[in-house]
Every structure is written in C-alpha cells, then in structure tokens.
Amino acid sequence: MSLRLSSGSKRSYARPSTGSLRGASFGAANACGVAGIGSGFSCAFGSSSTGGNTGVANSCAGFTVNEGGLLSGNEKVTMQNLNDRLASYLDNVQALQEANADLEQKIKGWYEKFGPGSCRGLDHDYSRYFPIIDDLKNQIITSTTSNANAVLQIDNARLTADDFRLKYENELALHQSVEADVNGLRRVLDEITLCRTDLEIQYETLSEELTYLKKNHKEEMQALQCAAGGNVNVEMNAAPGVDLTVLLNNMRAEYEALAEQNRRDAEAWFQEKSASLQQQITEDVGATTSARNELTEMKRTLQTLEIELQSLLATKHSLECSLTETEGNYCTQLAQIQAQISALEEQLHQVRTETEGQKLEYEQLLNVKAHLEKEIETYCLLIGGDEGACKSSSYKSKDYTSGNAGNQSKDSPKAIVVKKVLEEVDQRSKILTTRLHSLEEKSQSN
C-alpha cells in the first residue's frame, strides 16, 4: 500500500497491497513521512504475509525538517510518536490562532482608537480635521478681506494723492502766472517811477527857468525904472518905437500861461497815471495776498497729505508683512497637517497591508489545518480500516487483517486490497472534495 498527500491542485492516492498470504501469518511494512507546517503529508504502506510467521515493520519520518531519515520500530511506538508530533502540531496551530486573535484584537483596538471602522471595511476619517480646516479657511477669508480692504484704501489714497497732486500742479502754475504778472507790474511800476522822476526833473527845470525869467524881468524892470527917472532927451526922426514894457508883459504873460498849462497837463497826466497805477497795484497786491494765502494753505494741505500718505504706506507695508507672515504660518501649518495626514495614510496603508498579509496567512494556516485534519482523518481511516477510530489529540491503531482474523492457513487464497483516495484542492491548498474507494481482489495461492 502506498499513500502520498502533498499540496497541489489535484491528488490521487492508491493503496495497492502487494504480498502473499501463506498460512496464518500477517506482515506489514509502513513508511510514513509528514512535513512541517505548510508542507504536504505523505505516507506509504506495503504489506506482505507469508507462512505462519507474523512480522511487522514500520518506519516513519518525523513532522519536522530536522528528522529526515526513516525510523524503525514496532507500530505502537511509531503511532505514539505520530500522536505526539500531531499533538505538538495542534499546539502550534492553537498558539498561532491565539497570536492571530491577539493581533486582530490589537488591530481592532488601534482602529477603535485612531479611526472608525472595522477590520474588514475601513474608510478614511478626517472628521476631526474638518473644524481646523474650516477655522483656517475662515482665517484665510478674513485675511483676504482685510487685505482687499487695505488695497482698496491704498488705491483710494493713491487716487486722492493724485488729485491733490494735480491740484497742486494747477495751483503752482497759477502761482507762477501770478508771480509773472507781479514781475510785469513791478517793471511797469519801475517805468512809471522813471517817468515820474523825469516829470519831476522837467518840473524843476521849468520852475528854475520860471524863476530865472522872473529874476530877469525884475532886473529889467528896475533898470527901466532907473532909466525913466533921469532926463533923457531923445529926438526921434523915425517912426515911433515899440513899447518894451508892453512887449515884456505880453511875453511874461505868454510864458506864464504856457508854464501853467504845462504844469496842469503834467499834473493831470501824473494824477491819471498814478491813479490807474495805484488801482492796479492795489488789485495786484490783493491778488498776490490771496494767492499767497492760498499757496500757504495748499502747502499745509500738501504736507498733511504727504504725512497721511506716508502713514498709509507704512500701514500698507506692515499689512503686507503681516499677510506674508500669516500666509507663511498657514502654509507651514497646512504642510504639517498634510504631512500628518500623509503619515497617517501611510500608517493606515501599512496596517491594511499587514492586516491583509496576516489575513492571508491566517487563511493559509486554516486551509493547512483543515487539509492536515482531513489528511490525518484519512490516514486514520487507512490505518484502522473500517474498525479504526481517530480522535483530535490521540490515535489508536488496530491490526488490519485481510481475510480471516488470526493465523491463516497456508492453503488460503491470496488477497489483494487496493484503497484509493481522490482529493481535489484549489490554488490555495483548500480541499474541495475527498473520495475514498476500496477495492478487494482474491486470487488462488501459489
């Protein structure tokens, strides 16, 4: 009889019993090999019966890798060894199940502590980060609104400064025009002053000439009066002479009238020019004073606006610095949060991977356990036959006889028993179906 159980897609087991029955004796040879956890299970049986002698030979390879040779001894010792090793294997399986349950409990506790879900279906839970993200969004919106308001105020201040700059340029042009007019009026005033000086000089000249004429006239009158006081006998044969007194009086009257007319004309012209010039000077002085006051007011307004502009620029710079710092802080916080999220996702992925690996390993162990249990059950059935019994922790074997129990006579016929086990497994070494076929053939003795 030969039996081989190993991991594969499909296995067939054959138990040919080659031997001869002679007399009442029964002989059996047993070779069994069982690999460790995760490997197959193989057994080979051969039996022969001759004469009146009964001999039993049994050899079994151990369940571990270290024992690779064949063991010899009687069947009871071999079965006891197999039972001990099977108990050790079951203890190892139970320890692995306990370790797996412990790991599952730890994984479940970790998920209960760090996130909702179960070991079979886990979802990302970022609900605890939502309030922080909403707060950061609100702060960003508030900062953006403040920045927009500051930019709007800066633009308004810039437009106001541009308007005042235009007004200042217009007033400066008006001031320059007024100064040019004042300079022109000053030149006119200088010309009028020169003309007045000339007129005064002419007046003085005419006054001196008049004084000189009066003095000459007085001297001539005195000379004529002195001459008239003496005895002068003049005989005139010519026509009567011209009266000099009348002539001088006429000349004096003409000169006085001419001087008076010139004086009146000069005074009238001077008064007219002085009045118009004085009126123009008064108007120009008033305009100059008004322009000077307005210029002073514009200078004061310009200084105020410059101070306000400087304060707004300083406020803008401080707001820009604050905005830059706030953006940097928020970027740093977002980067830290993103790094934490990435780390948590990586940990979650690692835990999932480990869980899947442990799940697959656990399933493989369960499949191996079921496979080994079925193989052990089949092994017990093959060893004990129809009368054999197999338990979870210990196995008892009985003598398997072909034909009648006890000693067989030499003349009994030769019997060949063939037991075939068909087992179908999938790719994960999971047993799908198991079938056991027993065939018995009889033949004549030699």
Swiss-Prot record:
Principal localization reads cytoplasm
The protein's location, in the record's own words, is: Cytoplasm
Q: List every stretch annotated Linker 1.
A: 111-132
Q: Which Pfam families match?
A: Filament
Q: Which GO terms describe its molecular function?
A: protein heterodimerization activity; structural molecule activity
Q: Where is this region: Disordered?
A: 1-20, 394-413
Q: State any GO CC term.
A: keratin filament
Where do transmembrane segments lie in this chain? none
Q: Where is this region: Tail?
A: 387-446
- Indicate the segments annotated as coiled coil, or none if absent: none
Q: Where is this region: Head?
A: 1-74
Q: How does it assemble?
A: Heterodimer of a type I and a type II keratin. Heterodimer with type II keratin KRT5 leading to the formation of keratin intermediate filament (KIF) network. Interacts with KRT6A to form filaments.
Its recorded name reads Keratin, type I cytoskeletal 25
Gene name?
Answer: Krt25
